[in-house]
Amino acid sequence: MREAICIHIGQAGCQVGNACWELFCLEHGIQPDGAMPSDKTIGVEDDAFNTFFSETGAGKHVPRAVFLDLEPTVVDEVRTGTYRQLFHPEQLISGKEDAANNYARGHYTIGKEIVDLCLDRIRKLADNCTGLQGFLVYHAVGGGTGSGLGALLLERLSVDYGKKSKLGYTVYPSPQVSTAVVEPYNSVLSTHSLLEHTDVAAMLDNEAIYDLTRRNLDIERPTYTNLNRLIGQVVSSLTASLRFDGALNVDLTEFQTNLVPYPRIHFVLTSYAPVISAEKAYHEQLSVSEISNAVFEPASMMTKCDPRHGKYMACCLMYRGDVVPKDVNAAVATIKTKRTIQFVDWSPTGFKCGINYQPPTVVPGGDLAKVQRAVCMIANSTAIAEVFARIDHKFDLMYSKRAFVHWYVGEGMEEGEFSEAREDLAALEKDYEEVGAESADMDGEEDVEEY
């Protein structure tokens, strides 16, 4: 078996986790108490869901997941919520006092006390696996726990499980909507560590997903639940090949191989289609070519950045439902002819496609329509540098006055870490610039050397 362990860190990670596990259970016909009704004969022919669930002797299915937060309220919601019987109590770990939006508290003072316990639980889950593929880490980098403890945990996982791939679903601060003043500090410090210790990081941003739900689902004031359910669909599409059978299955490590041209350039854009409400879906065709075009629209991106401003380096399209390879090839051929979708000149093919026959499942009473087919795109584009540029700019404004820095230094951080992290991100922006640069001018220089 190729198992994957999910790690949900901090408030964002745990709440996204709730939405994801709700969806995974629905997709596999697992009830909130972990039982799988006997009339569901799915389990007989298809046990691929064991990548995400482990089966106990009593026939209960337990998610291979850990929820951790430095303060109890969010994890308590899981402990008392609909799915309280699904998780093993030891998998829900909470501390007493929170990180207070402070990276240093999450990484040094408070996080340090809880991290060994977390690793111990993760070790237990890993021992239950026959062939662990890797970890899916869900967190946000704007707060204290997700950024600080998230970075600390990833560093420790790199040491303990060096060769296993680590995929991050990372919520980055939005351009306009902010939940904390010190977001830029936390993000820069955390990204400094993510550069080293994650293999692929899918960037999400609340504002982009707000706009998407508001525009496409006609929800005037989307709540976090609406957003998380949409993120859940994306995560589900990306991991569908691990959990179901299909024509073209895609493995965790395959993402890495196909999306990451250079180790540092591993921050990817995601988008999903069709995001459509039930009233509209009734009147639309939603053919393969339509949904394939939709995922390339700047408006469907889950991060506020315009892919038209950059070039694509690689792109995975994960189809699910009633889709045949012939349609996919036709759709991809059309996309390649479009002028708006530009690839870097050193990546001529650039597309990886996956097809999964399981149609997308929707949460009953949710906002998304039940559709026959859906596609999720995960792409590596140089446009994502916009996100870093934006955060770096805000960081510089605050750091030039050393505002709020004493809170971090007081928790045992050194001021040098700020400048070190900031320099690392400046180098990252430079890397993106160079990758997107025309390689034609480089040929000219090489000719000079030869003659």
From Swiss-Prot:
It holds the Pfam family Tubulin. It catalyses: GTP + H2O = GDP + phosphate + H(+). The record marks Y451 as: Involved in polymerization. Undergoes a tyrosination/detyrosination cycle, the cyclic removal and re-addition of a C-terminal tyrosine residue by the enzymes tubulin tyrosine carboxypeptidase (TTCP) and tubulin tyrosine ligase (TTL), respectively. Mg(2+) binds at E71. It comes from the Eukaryota. Coiled coil: none annotated. PANTHER family: TUBULIN. This is Tubulin alpha chain. It comes from Trypanosoma brucei rhodesiense.
